[in-house]
Amino acid sequence: MFNNKTIVYTSGTFDMFHTNHLKMINYARGLGDVLIVGVSTDELVSSYKAPPIIPFNDRIQLVEALKATDIAIPQHTLDHTEIVKKLNIDAFVVGDDWFGKYDYLEEMGVKVFYFPYGNGISSSSLKKTIYDTYDKHLKAVQQTKPLTIKK
């Protein structure tokens, strides 16, 4: 398919797309000639954590629109064995919150990179901030005395 090209695969949910997602995708882009980005389906994400806020079709369209992305594909499983074989992946990049989970790909000749998110932004932190802000304002509204109009 991509003769004599270094093929890099990265994957994620990419819910509430943010700068750390972009940094990881750009990092992956720099490791090879072709970048394939797997976007986890809503069904896959829901099998191990709360469902995404942003629907799958919107998330994959956003990832496809990035300059760094050559191909965006649905990701239906957390096991990347088949995708590595099918697409002849040379390198795999994933966030360091998955550290150690994909070491098995190295036995298949794939270089595995765990991208350091650091203490920066994450989809989970964004969701928590939104919830906390909403909760704070809701409580403030509930504590406010209703207005009475004098006739």
Per-range role (PLM):
Residues M1-K151:
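Nucleotidyltransferase catalytic core that binds NTPs
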